[in-house]
């Protein structure tokens, strides 16, 4: 990844906590429990999914930085989205994401060019994944899910 792509991805991860909080600001319980698309997750589930997904990514980052090509586990995000913790107030996951991203950025700030090339093995991908790939993917993931919520708000006039 070129340095401008890397900077953008790190920036996207850095601003996600604020963007996600703003995206759900002022929504009532019924709105939080509205799917962002037919057959899709509710806004509440999306917020909790971001926390789940980014926790997994953070642990994978730490493993890749401290182990030699570690294998990581896949998880069923659809099943995760159905567990009881996804009925909690979104503030629980918003605070988790805020704290997690502060730690994530602290690590990113200390990484060398060599660190960004470190890899981990994911069972759903045929090749090892680099940390520069991971940061770009989660920068996209951050924008992607905020856009789901903001598009729903525009459609519904919220």
PLM regions and their residue ranges:
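Amphipathic, non-membrane alpha-helical segments in soluble helical-bundle scaffolds
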Residues: 6-17, 40-47, 90-94, 132-135
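A short secondary-structure junction motif
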Residues: 23, 27-30, 68, 111-114, ...
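Short, contiguous alpha-helical
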Residues: 33-78, 83, 105-106, 117-158
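Short, small-residue-biased leader/transition segments that mark boundaries at the very start
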Residues: 1-3
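A glycine-rich, hydrophobic loop/mini-helix early in the fold
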Residues: 14-40
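Acidic/histidine-rich alpha-helical segments that form the ligand environment
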Residues: 12-23, 80-118, 138
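Low-complexity, intrinsically disordered short peptide segments enriched in small/polar/basic residues
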Residues: 7-10, 21, 143-146
